[in-house]
């Protein structure tokens, strides 16, 4: 049927409405629907956020234990006390190791207008880079500890567990990104760890200085990760706001 010349405006509006509805359907279908179970409703997206937050809580505990172990185990305690003493004296090298974390280069905003106006997709991508920033350094620390002499199993096992949980958390975040933003392009950019050369050096002093940096940074960042996850869960699922 040929439409009269007086109808183009109406047909154009109808086409726009159809396209708009298709886009809304595509967005809704990208997010896992609630699945019925005997016990109630199960939402894969919410459950993945819960899994991520549980992993982040585990990381919090492991980071605490690792930090304490390094200060109390004979393998490292003496040198760590010296590092703290040098930190008070403002030794430049030790101060850098004790206060600077390379992961802050990808740290999401957590206060003020910048935080309130942050786009959720960008916020999620930034968190992926933030979480992933320590996976490479942890991998190298595990390798070095395996070849160092007299390394206690308690220290080695803690680093392994932290690395494993970091990878698990990163996979959860990647899954969330692909489900909520299926067409998003993600460029993972993990900043270089400047203390890697210290870790790879021959002297135990420098290896422990690298671990001094790693333990301080991971100890502090685990607090922030839980906050960021709660923010994202609220923004994306509307739960626990």
UniProtKB/Swiss-Prot annotation:
Cross-referenced Gene3D superfamilies: 1.20.1250.10
GO CC terms in record: extracellular region
Tissue expression as described in the entry: Detected only in placenta. Localized to spongiotrophoblasts and trophoblast giant cells of the placenta.
Record-level Gene Ontology MF annotations: hormone activity
Keyword annotations: Disulfide bond, Glycoprotein, Hormone, Secreted, Signal
Keyword tRNA processing in record: no
Glycosylated residues (UniProt): 213, 220
Lineage: superkingdom: Eukaryota
Signal peptide from the UniProt entry: 1-30
InterPro entries per the UniProt record, alphabetical: 4_helix_cytokine-like_core (IPR009079), Somatotropin/Prolactin (IPR001400)
Protein family per UniProt: Belongs to the somatotropin/prolactin family.
UniProt-recorded name of the protein: Prolactin-8A9
The species this protein was found in: Mus musculus (Mouse)
Lineage: Eukaryota, Metazoa, Chordata, Craniata, Vertebrata
Gene: Prl8a9
